[in-house]
Amino acid sequence: MPAVKIGIIGAGSAVFSLRLVSDLCKTPGLSGSTVTLMDIDEERLDAVLTIAKKYVEEVGADLKFEKTTSVDEAIADADFVINTAMVGGHTYLEKVRRISEKYGYYRGIDAQEFNMVSDYYTFSNYNQLKYFVDIARKIERLSPKAWYSAAANPVFEGTTLVTRTVPIKAVGFCHGHYGVMEIIEKLGLERKQVDWQVAGVNHGIWLNRFRYNGEDAYPLLPRWISEKSKDWKPENPFNDQLSPAAIDMYKFYGVMPIGDTVRNASWRYHRDLETKKRWYGEPWGGADSEIGWKWYQDTLGKVTDITKKVAKFIKENPALKLSDLGSVLGKDLSEKQFVLEVEKILDPEKKSGEQHISFHDALLNDNRSRFVINIPNKGIIQGIDDDVVVEVPAVVDRDGIHPEKIDPPLPERVVKYYLRPRIMRMEMALEAFLTGDIRIIKEVLYRDPRTKSDEQVEKVIEEILSLPENEEMRKNYLKK
């Protein structure tokens, strides 16, 4: 059983990092491994490290920890590098969004047809794209045999960029495919009897195969829609898998959009707050409305505060067990949710649902498993270029990644009317980044239904480029 080094970049993301640590503890084949936690926010990093060590101590696992603020130290001699970092954080994203809305671009210039997710910036996110390439080049130099796992958005643009420009082993991960499980549950099906397959691009995947006990299960959907969809209400802003938007997309494309694909719809569903509420449900209007996104940001802030609070309490009370947190934390909903998350990771029988550690285990220890991953197409999906990264199921073992045959193929409408337009915007974002041709970003906005004049385009781009953190971006785009 090989002990490995796993570097986690952006490890101050508490819940994500703790999920990975818990999965490592539940993976015997990776026992004895070293986890290097890297983040530029030392306070958050220390808090995560404290809780992670406490967890490992309680479950009796053999894991070693290192912490660092240096990307190089996280990467050096690593076998796997997981990147979840967002350059500039949500503060930068909101700066760009405010400037964009000042000039008439509701929810920001990066909110585009088929890319409405609020932290999935592609055109104003030069620093994030550059960070992806910088990390990949450091891996090439410091740990050329390591696998790079992309978890930070934009996964589609980022993983395509890295696989095209740096010769390392790279793969992207997302949670979106778990939307299939909600459909299975709502239809009252036994999960083990369902044969499903999804395919597309990150945040643009579709349920191409849906069979139950060997029979086509799609006929069950219209019945649910006619009998129960009228009673649907979202439990939180992200609960949209069976929303009116999802059902409307299904009726047009012929297959169900899965996970974040429901959010990444056309402007028909996103024109304004009232439109969003109609398609994604009251009271939030989905995760990407101004209300839904504030809910998400507030939740993130609370989780950060709770993480620090728990870490402080552990240091002051070393005899405390994580299983006792329920008696320590208050009755606030966010604290209750944090306790539930801890209870999940303490369950020795269940992994977190994050795919990274199981993927590594499959490669190292030949524990053959099925994943939904982001890899270069290379003929997997018909009608898409080979060097475009697609999100598809694959079996992974010691011999590598074995993509499944997409059967049945995606409907032509999905490929022609959804995937190709989304891919076009990805190509425009990457060409703009790589060439420094600002005209490409302008062209995107000239085509934008929110644009009323060329002057509007010039002003919004100029103000975004003038942000202090965008000095390098400005030099890149104004060098010609």
Curated annotation (Swiss-Prot):
Family annotation (SUPFAM superfamilies): LDH C-terminal domain-like, NAD(P)-binding Rossmann-fold domains
Activity under varying temperature: Optimum temperature is 85 degrees Celsius. Retains 80% activity after incubation at 85 degrees Celsius for 3 hours.
Substrates-to-products reaction catalysed: Hydrolysis of terminal, non-reducing (1->4)-linked alpha-D-glucose residues with release of alpha-D-glucose
Gene3D superfamilies in the cross-refs: AglA-like glucosidase
Regulation: Inhibited by EDTA in vitro.
Gene Ontology molecular function, alphabetical: alpha-1,4-glucosidase activity; metal ion binding; oxidoreductase activity, acting on the CH-OH group of donors, NAD or NADP as acceptor
Catalytic-site annotation from UniProt: H175, D260
Cofactor remark: Binds 1 NAD(+) per subunit. Binds 1 Mn(2+) ion per subunit.
Chain positions recorded as substrate binding sites: D119, N153
List of residues binding Mn(2+): C174, H203
Binding positions for NAD(+) per the UniProt entry: 4-70
Ribosomal protein as UniProt keyword: no
Listed EC numbers: 3.2.1.20
Domain of life according to the entry: Bacteria
Entry's Gene Ontology BP terms: carbohydrate metabolic process
pH-dependence annotation: Optimum pH is 7.5.
Enzyme class label: hydrolase
Coiled coil: none
Pfam families given in the database record: Glyco_hydro_4 (PF02056), Glyco_hydro_4C (PF11975)
Cofactor(s) essential for the protein: NAD(+); Mn(2+)
Keywords annotated in UniProt: Carbohydrate metabolism, Glycosidase, Hydrolase, Manganese, Metal-binding, NAD
Entry-linked PANTHER family: 6-PHOSPHO-BETA-GLUCOSIDASE-RELATED, ALPHA-GLUCOSIDASE
Family: Belongs to the glycosyl hydrolase 4 family.
General function of this protein: Is able to hydrolyze diverse types of alpha-glycoside bonds in di- and trisaccharides: alpha-1,4 bonds of maltose and maltotriose, alpha-1,1 bonds of trehalose, alpha-1,2 bonds of sucrose, alpha-1,3 bonds of turanose and melizitose, alpha-1,6 bonds of isomaltose and melibiose. Acts on the substrate from the non-reducing end of the chain. The activity of AglA drops with increasing length of the saccharide chain.
UniProt subunit comment: Homodimer.
Protein name listed in UniProt: Alpha-glucosidase
Species the sequence originates in: Thermotoga neapolitana
Gene it is expressed from: aglA
